[in-house]
A protein has these predicted regions:
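Short, Lys/Arg- and Gly-enriched loop/turn segments at beta-strand edges
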Residues: 128-141
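Short, basic/aromatic beta-hairpin or loop at an interaction surface
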Residues: 90-108
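Short, basic, low-complexity termini and linkers enriched in Ser/Thr/Gly/Pro
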Residues: 74-86
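Surface loops and adjacent helix of pleckstrin homology
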Residues: 87-91, 136
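Anionic-ligand-binding alpha/beta catalytic cores of soluble enzymes and soluble regulatory domains
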Residues: 1-62
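Short nucleic-acid-contacting surface segments enriched for D/E, G, S/T with interspersed K/R
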Residues: 109-124
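Structural detector for short beta-strands of small beta-barrel domains
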Residues: 59-76
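Short peripheral tails and domain-boundary helices/loops at the edges of structured domains
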Residues: 138-158
Length: 158
């Protein structure tokens, strides 16, 4: 079972308890809806940073969320650390949070972490670092939980 699919097994009461006790955000915990899930994007968009004095700008939230993208080009292929040009949807906020139209972005590829990638592969990345080649189900779950977190963040900001 993949870890994202396991999120469905976490009871909302446990998530609320974690938010109230560990993050010391009891008011937020009370407002969480039944469809809230403890995905990384939930933490980025809803719960906020663990360190209270850290202010996450919109651009930082885009970097911090786990993104997905399609590899368009591989640069410096012979190096241990190469660059990938990926197409992905950035996170924006106007009145509400949303994923924008696909754009190109350069990210880092540590070949020792993720040895085999090709143009056309879909992968996840975090803080501009390639993390994992995604299977279809992984991609669907990543999109699902990211969108769910966006919807919850927008609902709570009303």
């Amino acid at each position: 079972m993949d870890w994202q699919g396991a999120l469905e097994k976490v009871r909302i009461s446990k998530l609320k308890e974690m938010v109230a006790k560990n993050l010391k955000k009891s008011k937020l915990a009370e407002k969480l809806s039944e469809n809230s899930r403890g995905h990384h994007s939930f933490h980025v968009l809803v719960a906020g940073p663990m360190k209270r004095d850290l202010i996450m700008t919109e651009g930082m939230k885009d970097l911090c969320k786990i993104s997905w993208g399609k590899i368009l080009k591989i640069e410096d292929r012979k190096m241990r650390i190469a660059n990938l040009i990926v197409e992905y949807q950035p996170l924006f906020k106007e009145k509400k949070w949303f994923l924008g139209k696909p754009i190109k972005r350069k990210i880092f590829w540590f070949k020792s972490i993720l040895p085999k990638l090709r143009v056309g592969d879909i992968l996840s990345f975090h803080w501009d670092l390639a993390l994992e080649k995604l299977r279809k189900r992984d991609l669907e779950n990543l999109k699902k939980y990211t969108q769910l977190s966006i919807e919850i963040a927008n609902y709570l900001k009303k």
